[in-house]
Amino acid sequence: MSDGAALTEDAVGDTVLSIDAMGGDLGPASVVSGLAKASAKNPTLRFIVHGDKPELERLIAKKRGLADVCELRHTKDVVTMDAKPSHVMRNGKDTSMWSTIEAVRDGDASVAVSCGNTGALMAISMIRLRKLEGVNRPAIACLWPSRNPSGFNVMLDVGADIRADAEDLLQYALMGASYARNGLDLSRPRIGLLNVGTEEHKGRAELKVAAELIDRAAPAADFEFVGFVEGSDLPSDRVDVIVTDGFTGNVALKTGEGTARLIRELLEQAFKKTPFSRVAALLAFTSLRRLSKRIDPRRVNGGVFLGLNGTVVKSHGSADPTGVAAAINLAAQLSATGFHKRLAARIAQAEAAASVAIQKEGSSE
């Protein structure tokens, strides 16, 4: 699921994406610039853009040809980054975020994209799109750079809910396996449960129970459970999907992003320090550019809400145009593969099969 490659025209078809232009720290200018970048690579994409119409018209007019692929829907309010989800649920109907989700609910667009307040976006998504049958807590899944052939691992939850009991973690494993099949084209994903160590006796009680549930469900759900994994396994090729609660996952995600930025900054400083280091940088330019791209958090910008009757991609609030374009391209790929319908069917099948397997094993004990 590389953000750099353009989709073929046949794959995209008449894909329409719903874009919240007003969410995010950098405002609508960054979102519109990201739209222009994504449209340049995939010119058959169409967008429904939500926000302040006069401001959006002015920004879009500066991007050649962008107005031709955008439908604007005016909203008078914006969900701020410090807004409480409960307040937005009661008073947010006139916001760009609400309108963005509504377009997916009404079938006008296939995927929603927003850089806005994560809690508010999840709250609106849950009340307007509703949860898939059998899902207790939706999760946010992200792609994590790794040594695997695809270049990525999937990790969830990374911030939808700070709590998760054993049953929730089992559902995350089922949803993560489905995402890996559809998003990374893995026929039998390897699932790992994040813990403070790989030994079976380590970790909280709910993690040990979750490990048993996931292990029992694995044969029927057609994935491999590798057991507990720890932080050092996140970028490894030992696992394809890392399952954890939203608190731990979000801390891990932000730590990884901060570390990647630190490495880039330290490399830049090191190669600018002396004339000799500048020459070395020129000689190693191609390799350094490849490394920089590989660890750039912007190229995997976009968490996917799993477990809802609709697909929502959450971009980072601080995403620049490159990051916004990556999130839009991810949304386009999910739409082109019919991800939501396949995920819903897979979860229903996996839940049923896992339930039968667990009941059989329980009755035989």
From Swiss-Prot:
Family stated for the protein in its record: Belongs to the PlsX family.
Record's keyword terms, sorted: Cytoplasm, Lipid biosynthesis, Lipid metabolism, Phospholipid biosynthesis, Phospholipid metabolism, Transferase
EC class of the enzyme, as a word: transferase
Associated pathway: Lipid metabolism; phospholipid metabolism
Any single GO BP term: fatty acid biosynthetic process
Known partners and oligomeric status: Homodimer. Probably interacts with PlsY.
Gene Ontology MF terms: phosphate:acyl-[acyl carrier protein] acyltransferase activity
Primary location: cytoplasm
InterPro entries cross-referenced by the UniProt entry: FA_synthesis, Phospholipid_synth_PlsX-like
Gene source species: Jannaschia sp. (strain CCS1)
Function of the protein: Catalyzes the reversible formation of acyl-phosphate (acyl-PO(4)) from acyl-[acyl-carrier-protein] (acyl-ACP). This enzyme utilizes acyl-ACP as fatty acyl donor, but not acyl-CoA.
Short name of any one Pfam family annotated for the protein: FA_synthesis
GO cellular component: cytoplasm
Protein's UniProt name: Phosphate acyltransferase
Compartments, as annotated in UniProt: Cytoplasm
Catalysed reactions listed for this entry: a fatty acyl-[ACP] + phosphate = an acyl phosphate + holo-[ACP]
EC annotation from Swiss-Prot or TrEMBL: 2.3.1.274
